[in-house]
Amino acid sequence: MLLGAIEAGGTKFVCATGAENGQVSDRISIPTTTPVETMTAVDDYFTTHPVDAIGIGSFGPIGVNPHDPKYGYITTTPKPGWGDFDFLGHLKSQFNIPLYWTTDVNEAAYGESMIGIAKDVPNSIYMTIGTGVGAGVISQNHIFNGRTHTELGHMRLNRLPGDDFKSNCPYHDICLEGLAAGPAVGKRTGKAGKDIPVDDPVWPIITDYIAQACVNLTVAFAPDKIILNGGVMNQRQLFPMIREKFAAYLNGYEEVPPLDDYIVPAGLGNNSGIAGGLLLAQAALKNA
């Protein structure tokens, strides 16, 4: 049995084949240009690398409710040309195999939950903080969706005194993505993340907002583990700062696991999404 995975990002698509244990046997990276160009390359890949099922995680917003007429679509994305694109419908027209459709962060969350750092617990949250902020919630080893998928990067926070930075989010003045995602860090400092010193005064601000978000996730979902990934979180010195501020904000109200095991980096690194896609392909095949 050979399984397929698609990690569809706003900059690039990663397509891969692999096994039911999430191990990748082959992969390719495709630039995200137009739907016609990018999807033609996706079709070509899986035509020359035939698989039994494909797990797809896409940038969004997307339609994830099977009862929604827009199920399978990329909906209101600002990505030029991709708004109202029937992603799942296109793949169904090309491949007569089981398909699993979800968000890119849900895909990564599932990978970490099944074979990554959260494999020993049933409830976890995976949050990526990079170009944007997105999060996937795993509840009792299943992906959590409500009316639609979560948009936890846009949770409202308390602005720090003296922080007069204009939010980078066009919709919200004090959301996590607007204040602490990679572009916000860049605008605050005028530097690329890799060029910002570990002792730069921006990091206490960024870690405070991430800690606030982790408290919100804790009281809302009661996870066993919060996994932080993405370009901003490549700065490993941020984790102790986040844990310290998290403990201060939670203030002993709720018992949580030891913080070194509770707020953690991804176990699969940049492979979380593709591994999750392979595992979701396996689930789609079993449910077919």
From Swiss-Prot:
GO molecular function ontology, one term from the record: fructokinase activity
Keywords: ATP-binding, Carbohydrate metabolism, Kinase, Magnesium, Metal-binding, Nucleotide-binding, Transferase, Zinc
Residues noted as binding Zn(2+) in the record, renumbered to the chain: 154, 169, 172, 175
Binding site for ATP: 131, 183, 231-235
Catalytic reactions on record: D-fructose + ATP = D-fructose 6-phosphate + ADP + H(+)
Chain's gene name: scrK
Enzyme class: transferase
InterPro entries listed in its UniProt record: ATPase_NBD, Carb_Metab_Reg_Kinase/Isom, ROK, ROK_cs
Family of the protein in this entry: Belongs to the ROK (NagC/XylR) family.
Protein name: Fructokinase
Required co-factors: Mg(2+)
Lineage of source species: Bacteria, Bacillati, Bacillota, Bacilli, Lactobacillales
EC number: 2.7.1.4
Taxonomic superkingdom: Bacteria
Pfam entry (one): ROK
PANTHER family on file: FRUCTOKINASE, TRANSCRIPTIONAL REPRESSOR MPRA
Description of how activity is regulated: Inhibition by zinc ions.
